[in-house]
């Protein structure tokens, strides 16, 4: 998803387009990895001095509820990234930097075959580890 797509989702749901929301979405599009709310707040504070953590957090949860961003828990903390909408895939997530890599493999059919009497509504596969760049920096 890009910023314009996200703004379209906001408008389709009767929500206001604001420069703050656009700038927050731009951060996700530009960085393209999982980010915590504090990082977003610090980035936003450069252009909007004094922006509250509550304002950032409310918008993050609004974006998540609308499917604009995705979330995961990493090291006991919620992290967010722009939603991937181009095709079904899963992610490798670096535990150090939050960088993500696409995994174009989905085990859901195998899982369904092992659970024939259940109705699976949705699924999410995340693989965690240390990316090549962080490994290189550690050595």
Swiss-Prot record:
Residues 1-85 are annotated as: DNA-binding. It is found in: Cytoplasm. GO terms for biological process: negative regulation of DNA-templated transcription; regulation of secondary metabolite biosynthetic process. The keyword NADP does not apply. Transmembrane segments: none annotated. Residues 86-139 are annotated as: Dimerization. One of its GO terms (molecular function) is DNA-binding transcription factor activity. Its main location: cytoplasm. Zn(2+) binds at residues 94, 97. The keyword Cell wall biogenesis/degradation does not apply. Fe cation binds at residues 88, 90, 109, 123. GO terms for cellular component: cytoplasm. Signal peptide: none annotated. Acts as a global negative controlling element, employing Fe(2+) as a cofactor to bind the operator of the repressed genes. This is Ferric uptake regulation protein.
């Amino acid at each position: 998803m890009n910023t314009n797509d996200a703004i379209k989702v906001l408008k389709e749901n009767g929500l206001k387009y604001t420069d703050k929301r656009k700038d927050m979405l731009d951060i996700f599009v530009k960085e393209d990895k999982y980010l915590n709310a504090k990082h977003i707040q610090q980035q936003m504070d450069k252009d909007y001095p004094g922006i509250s953590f509550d304002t950032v957090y409310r918008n993050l949860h609004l974006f998540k509820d609308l499917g604009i961003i995705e979330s995961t828990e990493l090291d006991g903390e919620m992290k967010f990234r722009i939603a991937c909408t181009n095709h079904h895939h899963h992610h490798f997530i670096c535990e150090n930097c939050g960088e993500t890599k696409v995994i174009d493999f989905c085990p859901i059919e195998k899982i369904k075959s092992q659970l024939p009497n259940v109705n699976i509504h949705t699924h999410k596969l995340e693989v965690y580890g240390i990316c090549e760049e962080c490994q290189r920096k550690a050595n």
